[in-house]
Amino acid sequence: MKRLLLTLLLVSITCTVFAQRPNNYQNITKIKISGNITDSETAEPLEYATISLVNERFPNRIQGGITDENGNFDIEIFPGKYNITLEYIGFQKVTLENRIIRETTLLGDFKLNINSESLNEVELIGERTEVEIRLDKRIYNVGKDITVRGGSVTDVMDNIPAVSVDVEGNISLRGNDNVRILINGKPSGLVGLSGSAALRQLPAESIEKVEVVTSPSARYEASGTAGIINIILKKDELIGFNATFIANAGIPEYLGGTATLNWRTKRLNIFSTTTYRDQKSLGGGVFNSEYFNGDLPSSFANETRDYDRIRKNYFVNLGAEYYINDKTSLTISGFIRDSNNTSDANTEIDDLNANGDVLSSVDRLQEEAEEDNSSQFTANFTKKFNDDGHELVAEIQLQKSTEDEFADISNSDSPSETAGTLESQKRNLFQLDYVWPIDKNTQFEFGYRGDFSSQENDYEIAIKENGRFIIDSNLSNVLLFEQNINALYTQFGAKINKFSYLLGLRMENTNIVIDQKTTNDFKEKKYTNFFPTVNLSYEFSEEENITLGFSRRIRRPRSWSLNPFPSRSSVTFFRQGNPDLDPSYSSTFDFGYLKRWEKLTLNGSAYYQKATQVITRITEATGEVVRVSEDPIIEIPSLRATSINLAENNRLGTEFTLTFTPSRKFRLSGNFNIFNSETIGTYNNQVFDAEIVSWFARINSNVTLPKGWTAQLRGFYRGPNATAQSKSKGFFVLSGAINKDVLNKKGTLSFNASDLLNSRFYRNTTTTKLFTNYSEFQWRRPSYVMTFTYKINERKNQRRKRGQNYGDGGDDVEF
């Protein structure tokens, strides 16, 4: 009995001791370990690197922490014997084994080496890989391009392979200006009445990335024979509050500021961007013409023109995304944009004889004021049925744009004039997309899109007579234009081992109404078209693949090209639309190749496009002459610019991009595009055949310097080009920028110099049977901009996997 009681007592004491031991362990005084972790190559601190400590006696009790923005860590632990691991995604980990730590200890400084294999699987937020390749598009991330800081969207476009921007800001893709520009995957009021001109008002800092789609799938609208450029705006998805404030100042006179705010909880994400810009832009050019007078000597007219433009605008975007549950979300957003612009154009016109003697001289001053406003409301409902991409997305978008333009025109030899243009546009967009991944390697989708727009143009000219302005009814008109497009699409894609394909078909029904109120001309056009798409890909390895794409596209005439009422820009020249203009259709084949080596990446493609009923602008004589001088008598043929359909255009080209990265401190990339364009067709017994070989190239270098400095230099050359009646010369542009991190990397100072050589001139020669014209034009002179950026709660080193969906409304095709 005593032995039993003794045994029970020992067991009880033992259990009590072991039961109390953890509590006693917890009461032991903690100590600290500290140190610093940096990148071995750049010496930059690694924020959010992890430090984990495993006690040999208690392996399930893991202690640890993370580094701060300076790469420092300071962690409280219990004394003991530990295996310590220091890790950062994309770098080789460091392990310290069997370290006995009994007191506060400084572990020291650790320099982690890059792990090239794991780095290929992740990417830095704000510093992602410059180019991503998808089955049907290329994605260019903007974050690292410091030469566009303080600039606009057009400056970003001017540095993207295959994209070029002319001196007037017009955007073309592979030399074709019929490119469709989308914002977050949808048409936008930012690309409304003013076209690409409105993009100059959107700051470069608001852009997350740009998608270049040369072989669009069936989900995309069929407009744009060159392809699609999709601009994705920034929207932070990180939990908590973060903000970015940007201030710009430059020469010529330029002041600007941007505030981007984002607040995210588990269920709600609120985001906003506010921008203000006040910019002065100087430009000008010369326009020299020779008019043929049959057997008589030619007459000449030389114009010298100077522009002084001031643009003041603000842009406010506000939105909220509410997560009803883990698989259902509702997003509501909207923006307003207001722009007040003035432009003074001073023109001196000299009429000369064949000997070069000035016969008469006219001074012309045109003072123009423009108010351009737009607003947009968007509501998006997304229902995810699972985590594999099975979803239903419904979206509605309402847009409204107005543009009021008034000009006072005074001539030294004729009465003054006033011209006013009132334009308004409404556009409603409805879209429904359903995506069903049948299994991990197979996907089916279909959808509907309704695009309904109406536009009213009121153009009025008044001429001063006896001190009063009298409306000239021969030059004033009102045009109503409506365009309604209903579309259905479906596509099916699959991946079989290393082979992927995406097959699609899109149907679009178009109804256009042209109502010229002044002349009571009414015309209605209806047509239905089918647009097949094919995208194929074969992956030899993770470093090498090929793609093949086919798409059929359409180019619909714009309202101004259909308006039959003449619009005069001078006494001898006017523009007139063609209401019989038909849409143009194109079929494009695109073959792509991608190869990655350790330090070199090659991305190339070859393409062929055949377009029919090509919309072409021509200048022709009206058969009338205009007397521009009485003493001596000088008569000049009256000319008209209009648009016509020619038979066809064939475009064959190739492009490639090489990126060389010998180290993380230096990157060199180059892009080259060359194409042959052949236009065939006749109009009014006149042959408009033309063929040209043109090319453009760009080179870009990025250097990381010590103490937080970075530098970038880029050059762009656009080769000669030609149309049915004109030829343009090539030009070269050199720009550069430097960048310095300040305030513990919370702030950045950037200095950007654009067109360092003052060489961006557009030189063009137009030749017809009646005249030849040479023009040399500069849209804007060199500019220099200083930008300061300050960020609050930015987690720039946090990483995410490649291929994560950004919710941009685009068409990511992945299996």
Walk through the language-model features, giving the residues of each.
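Short, acidic, small-residue-rich periplasmic hinge/interaction motif at the N-terminus
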Residues: 25, 38, 50-54, 87-89, ...
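Short, acidic Ser/Thr/Gly-rich low-complexity loop/linker segments typical of extracellular
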Residues: 56-72
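Short acidic/polar hinge/loop motifs at secondary-structure boundaries
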Residues: 76, 153, 159, 186-214
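N-terminal periplasmic accessory domains that precede
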Residues: 108-111, 153-154, 195-198, 212, ...
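Surface-exposed extracellular loop regions of Gram-negative outer-membrane beta-barrel proteins
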Residues: 227, 231-245, 313-319, 330, 402, 511-513, 542-588, 608-636, ...
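Transmembrane beta-barrel wall of Gram-negative outer-membrane proteins
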Residues: 253-281, 297-345, 373-375, 534
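Outer membrane beta-barrel strand-and-loop segments of large Gram-negative receptors
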Residues: 418, 427-431, 472-477, 482, ...
